Amino acid sequence: MKAQPPLRLTAQAMAFVLAGGRGSRLKELTDRRAKPAVYFGGKARIIDFALSNAMNSGIRKMAIATQYKAHSLIRHIQRGWNFFREERNEYLDILPASQRVDENRWYLGTADAVTQNIDIVDSYDIKYVIILAGDHVYKMDYEIMLRQHCETGADVTIGCLTVPRAEATAFGVMHVDANLRITDFLEKPADPPGIPGDEANALASMGIYVFDWAFLRDLLIRDAEDPNSSHDFGHDLIPAIVKNGKAMAHRFSDSCVMTGLETEPYWRDVGTIDAFWQANIDLTDFTPKLDLYDREWPIWTYSQIVPPAKFIHDSENRRGTAISSLVSGDCIVSGSEIRSSLLFTGCRTHSYSSMSHVVALPHVTVNRKADLTNCVLDRGVVVPEGLVIGQDAEEDARWFRRSEGGIVLVTQDMLDARARALN
């Protein structure tokens, strides 16, 4: 009998995506949606990057744990990720926080989100589990990381990257030896330790963990019985493994998917208004830092059935144009000028208006003679005629959310409050 080719490692693995976080540093952008459901790049949601990485890596079994403001996220997954077929041994389960039998609590922490769904993970009949954060933007081949995990015999393998020490307070920070074995792990330290020989930077966790499922399963059960645990991977489980087991680091640069267009590995947290705006605006550069045009590593998402973008009017001072910008389907640029901006699906910009370095989420309307610079417009915002943003910092801060970096977040609630105050 002809020998069968060996299974890919990812065929024996599942991705467990933690997608329940609010992302409070994004302020009003997450008032109505969880951070993983926040829009990114013209048509995608942030969670699409983790799911696409898993899909492109060969993983066909996924579970998504949701909690905060989950409706828009669940609807997006149902619409855009509904092609998994049980007949092909493919699964994508959405696991909302719920009070299960004999329990009266929601997810208590990142580890507890997995613990409460042990029976579901068991049903997948997998050998490895890859724990993923659903709120980061990057392209990564998880199979390379999984292969390292198997070759080293680690209890856990943690994805890591180098970040400036000043930014490392938001991450788990680790020390490693010459063989990438983790010797110390601190979750979100107030004073992050630097890398020996490179004290300006720290080695930060990406929130990506690879485990043998049998090992993690036992660890989760013991953690659930510990009254002193916060039931969190970064605070409880990972430090315990570093101390008592074998924890290995995996450098993101070893598995980052790059096309040659990017000059360095790309990973963004987009956890603040400034970071969110910058990462979107970066896509308008002549040579973007993140290549979304890679047909070998597509970012899968829900695609609405909409007509192409349209540009109308061609008279002096009333010409529908977009320069160094991304304009999505169903947008109509009518006699207005768009520069270095990103328009999501279904936006309308009217005559004599101008936009520069603006991120407009779906179904935004910009009325006549508006002049907008350096701002983020939330979904469905209707910008009134003649509104000016980005020229007077004091006036911007009076009505809207102005970030430390000078980026202005505009929501419909803010515009309505402004209209009531001025009338």
From Swiss-Prot:
List membrane-spanning regions: none
**Which controlled-vocabulary keywords does the entry list?**
ATP-binding, Carbohydrate metabolism, Glycogen biosynthesis, Glycogen metabolism, Nucleotide-binding, Nucleotidyltransferase, Transferase
Listed pathway(s)? Glycan biosynthesis; glycogen biosynthesis
One GO biological-process annotation of the entry reads:
glycogen biosynthetic process
- Pfam families under this entry? Hexapep_GlmU (PF24894), NTP_transferase (PF00483)
CDD domains the record matches: ADP_Glucose_PP, LbH_G1P_AT_C
Cite the record's note on assembly.
Answer: Homotetramer.
In terms of HAMAP family, this protein maps to:
GlgC
**Protein's name according to its UniProt entry:** Glucose-1-phosphate adenylyltransferase
Query: Which source organism does the UniProt entry give?
Result: Cereibacter sphaeroides (strain ATCC 17023 / DSM 158 / JCM 6121 / CCUG 31486 / LMG 2827 / NBRC 12203 / NCIMB 8253 / ATH 2.4.1.) (Rhodobacter sphaeroides)
